[in-house]
Amino acid sequence: MAPAALWPQVNGGVEVEFNSSGGSSRLPLAECAAVAFELDCSPVRGFPAFRGQGNYPGLWWFSTTREHVGYESWSERDHLIALDADPAVVGVASQPFRLHWGDGRHHVPDYFVRLSDGTATVLDVRADDRISDADAELFDRSEQACRSLGWAYRRAGVADPVVTANLRWLSGYRHPRVYRPAVAAALEAVFDSARPLMTGVRPVGEAIMVLPVLFHLLWPRRLGVDLSAAVLTEESIVGPALSR
């Protein structure tokens, strides 16, 4: 990454192009710190679709905001699922803006992420083995631009396969219709002390009725389980939410 002393020269001519309810805009970077990209902006570009395409674009129903959010590849989808399950995330925008530099180069980050404390993270998803020197320079420039506004910037590679497998499973129970208040209260009481998953489920009721609610609670981490240790089984240790 370029030394911080060079950031003013790099970022001084940066402009941000985005689409909001008021129309298309292209503003100096310094004027965009307060733009609510996650609330008021549509994607600055679409996803191409053609025969023989090597990636798989689509839409993810983002349970946090109850809106669809786009992804351009399965790798992006996996990271989007993780953002949806993260209780600290309150909003996400796909393809939120295009950064323009004075030398004619430009870049569209994959996601703008708003956190519950009001801070923001800009996310690019690209596997390590798919980053060229030109890509690396654009990611570096993007990080500098974001940091100059107080935003965090992260380039994510391939998501952890075990965590991803668990989140994909739990995501099937993320919809609010799965929630049953009485069952949820009973589960939170029994798992106030950590124990194997099915050991806690059986006293609450029939597994076919109780497990969906348990998975619904594990999705936003209202109950805690180590999703990175192994794929969820009857013996997975479930306990209180880690934030308690």
Predicted regions: what they are:
Residues M1-R244:
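Electrostatic, structured charged patches in enzyme active sites and in nucleic-acid/phosphate-binding
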